[in-house]
Curated annotation (Swiss-Prot):
The lineage of its organism: Bacteria, Bacillati, Actinomycetota, Actinomycetes, Mycobacteriales. It holds the Pfam family PNP_phzG_C. It comes from Mycolicibacterium smegmatis (strain ATCC 700084 / mc(2)155). InterPro entries: Pyridox_Oxase, Pyridox_Oxase_CS, Pyridox_Oxase_N, Pyridoxamine_oxidase_dimer_C, Split_barrel_FMN-bd. It is an enzyme of class 1 (oxidoreductase). Substrate binds at R21, V22, E23, Y24, K87, Y144, R148, S152, R213, V214, H215. Catalyzes the oxidation of either pyridoxine 5'-phosphate (PNP) or pyridoxamine 5'-phosphate (PMP) into pyridoxal 5'-phosphate (PLP). Its cofactor is FMN. Homodimer. This is Pyridoxine/pyridoxamine 5'-phosphate oxidase.
Length: 230
């Protein structure tokens, strides 16, 4: 599984994307998403609802319940997306950490605006966020860095993220080198080119799948909340 029988051959047997379809039904048992789920103040209610949905996904046993697809735009205006882990959700926004010299870091240096989508397919839910992006403080980065497993810290040092490399063996050799370099240190320092980005939400949209594609969509823009047609 995962490796084609013939990489240069035809598509798998009975491969028909047009007929791949799952009918959405109520999966969460909590009724239809509506504007009142955001409370009296949508400007802050989005945060509580997003935190609740992430926690629901975690309790349901979904893998990487805090994973989100982050979209950036390169210098030529071409969009790029990738999955990353959200590591903080607070009134200021949603935060993720990465190598500042990575492709997304280069994009954000040119266009400091991004989108993020949390997809929880098994629950029939999705949240989309977009807004301006800023780097978090060195102190906040250091606090999160201290919570990462040592192996993950070493991996951050070993990888020149988004840069080509000859083979996996070469990558593991780089990891071995940094492992030896920091072997005598109790704490691995934060790489100078590594840290967090925070997306300050300008728009937050909650999506809930329903039968016949008549889905529920609630959009929050500042203090304004509105239902959108699916």
């Amino acid at each position: 599984m995962g490796i084609p029988d013939d990489p240069a051959g035809s598509a798998p047997e009975n491969f028909d994307l047009a007929t791949m379809r799952v009918e959405y039904v109520e999966k969460d048992g909590c009724g239809d998403l509506d504007v009142d789920w955001l409370g009296d103040d949508p400007a802050t209610g989005w945060l509580t609802l997003l935190q609740t949905w992430i926690n629901d996904a975690w309790k349901a046993g979904l893998p990487d319940a805090n994973a989100m697809v982050v979209g950036t735009v390169d210098a030529d205006g071409r969009p790029v997306t990738r999955s990353v882990l959200c590591k903080s959700v607070d009134p200021d926004g949603i935060t993720f950490y990465t190598n500042y010299d990575s492709a997304k870091g280069e994009h954000l240096a040119v266009n400091a605006y991004a989108s993020a989508t949390f997809p929880w397919y098994q629950l029939g839910r999705q949240v989309h966020v977009r807004g301006a992006v800023t780097k978090v403080s060195a102190e906040e980065t250091a606090e999160y860095w201290s919570k990462r497993p040592r192996g993950s810290q070493l991996g951050a040092w070993a990888s020149q993220q988004s840069r080509p490399i000859a083979s996996r063996a070469a990558l593991l050799e780089q990891l071995a080198e940094v492992t030896e370099r920091f072997a005598d240190l109790d704490e691995v320092p934060v790489p100078p080119n590594w840290g967090g980005y925070r997306i300050a939400p300008e728009v937050v949209e909650f999506w809930q799948g329903r039968e016949n594609r008549v889905h529920n969509r609630i959009r929050v823009t500042g203090g304004r909340v509105e239902r959108l047609q699916p």
